[in-house]
Amino acid sequence: MAAFTVIIIGGSISGLTLANVLEKYGIKYILLEKRPSIGPQLGATVVVHPSGLHLLSQLGLRERVEELATPVELQKAIGPDGTFVLNIAATNQCDRTIADALSTGYMPMFIARQDLIKVLYDNLQDKFRVHASLGLRELEWAGDKVKVTTTDGTSVVGDIVVGADGANSRTRAEIWKIADVEDPSYGSQQLAKSIACTYRCVFGMVDDGDSSLARTAYLAFQYNRAYTYLPTDSGRAYFLAFFKNPAKTVNDAIPRYSDQDEDADVAAHANDIIVPGLTFGDLYKRRTRCTLVPLQEYLLDKCFYKRVVLIGDAVHKLNPITGRGANLAIEGAALLGDLIKHALEKSLQPTDEMLQTAFFTYQQCTKSRAPSQIDDAHRVQSLAALENPLLKFMSLKLLKRATADKLALGVAVDFSTGHSMRYLPQLPQRGMVPLNKDVVANPEHRPASSTVLWIILMLGMASLGAVWQKHQRAEEDQPIHGYTLLTLSTFYNLMILFASAVHGSLGRRAVNLSFSDDSGMVPFYAVGHAPDKYRPTTPSRRVGLLVPGPSYLGSGGHFNGLLEVA
């Protein structure tokens, strides 16, 4: 019996991550890359966040990535006039305490896209399975197999095909073409309409940046445009210039840009301040690499057809201003690798039904995780580009209130809900925040009807407490009565429920935590697990969802709260 074979189209971050996972799992694969070499000088830099670093650690790659990457220790934002409007750092004991309590143990870092691809490629033991200069020309079914015809006429047959060939995926185009003929209800034309573009971006690099600015991510705000500047310890620096398009375009109408378009954007905005003392024009003159591309944004509602599945930018694409794209690609590849391994544990030759189940699970997980990241990136872009007076006010006046503890909370939520590969050795917890898989009281989905029922119940309990108090005579020095405490507790719960409704979170996932700390400082910790220095009470299910900040409740304080994890 021939070994189950996975054909990977594209030597991208997602494609090479999947190749590494499959190799670790002993699953045969063939990777086809259309370009003459693996890891060409395309793109500028990518940011690897804690959830991605955890997966790279499982593959044994964290140390090598850290050698080549620059950690992000500070985040600063600059207004149109060149003054700082945001400086996120742990600048006081309060911020440091909360940031430490929410630590994941992994520092976000940026690395050249080419370097990350090289790390992934170099880690492969069986490099003979990777073939350059072989792009996809056509897909067709061959019984219970898939036949791939490459651009040079070579035919390769496998059990499944994984399209990891980017935003302009040839694999995606092929399955849409096939589905249009075989199953018009698949809706490929509707899927294509979800691919939209509202911004374009100049990706660039200089080799003579100021290394004294390293380890800081700079974001420059301008009207209908924005800039990201990432200097490294070596003096190399990466920059991204985002420009809002005149109108939103969809799929085939999304423009392609020429060198003349790039020159025009630079000429129009050369005086924009990137950091104090450095303009966009100055930076562009010193560029060693640069390109102007459209920024597609989308999440496909369907990411597979029969025995072909899409990963990475082929299925979801977000604005790079938050640096989350590579992380999603790594996570998706790791998840799909786990699902393929799981199917093969049931049968060495999984049936169509078994593979469809695996792909559907991957699709649903992607649709659960990716939307918030795509929406966050879109919102950050709108804020940075000062798109309207309200966003201008928020960016230039309110953003300066952001602190390290608030940033740490967002990182903790993202990390805790990330994926961990099931069939590789599980790593010890590095920071204070665990993954959901390590939490006993995991969050659950809850229907809105249950939330409404709890609201009614809590209102009833609050009313009982209030009625009882009307019949009690309390002296000035009398301690608070138990029913008053009941009323206050109920009011607290109602406020959580109200916050949940306001944030549109009814029916989403939440977990209740309750911590005591003799120090009197009780930072709100993440997702159902307390470090040793805290004494957790029994976690209980509650309805609603809220993300509170730190609470200082006095010596021996006690804190209950709910943390968003979906």
Curated annotation (Swiss-Prot):
Record flagged with keyword Oxidoreductase: yes
GO cellular component: membrane
Gene Ontology MF terms: FAD binding; monooxygenase activity
Keywords attached to this entry: FAD, Flavoprotein, Membrane, Monooxygenase, Oxidoreductase, Signal, Transmembrane, Transmembrane helix
Compartments where found: Membrane
Residue intervals passing through the bilayer: 448-468, 482-502
A Pfam family annotated for this UniProt entry: FAD_binding_3
GO biological process: secondary metabolite biosynthetic process
EC number: 1.-.-.-
Entry-linked InterPro entries: FAD-bd, FAD/NAD-bd_sf, FAD_mOase_fung
Coiled-coil spans in chain: none
Membrane-topology annotation of the record: Multi-pass membrane protein
Signal peptide extent: 1-19
Residues that, per the record, bind FAD: E33, V47, R113, D313, A326
Chief localisation class: membrane
Function comment: FAD-dependent monooxygenase; part of the gene cluster that mediates the biosynthesis of the aspoquinolone mycotoxins. Within the pathway, the FAD-dependent monooxygenase asqG catalyzes the epoxidation of the terminal C7'-C8' olefin to produce the intermediate [(1'E)-5'-(3',3'-dimethyloxiran-2'-yl)-3'-hydroxy-3'-methylpent-1'-en-1'-yl]-quinolinone B. The first step of the pathway is catalyzed by the nonribosomal peptide synthetase asqK that condenses anthranilic acid and O-methyl-L-tyrosine to produce 4'-methoxycyclopeptin.
PANTHER family: FAD-BINDING DOMAIN-CONTAINING PROTEIN-RELATED (PTHR47356:SF2), FAD-DEPENDENT MONOOXYGENASE ASQG-RELATED (PTHR47356)
Protein name listed in UniProt: FAD-dependent monooxygenase asqG
Provenance organism: Emericella nidulans (strain FGSC A4 / ATCC 38163 / CBS 112.46 / NRRL 194 / M139) (Aspergillus nidulans)
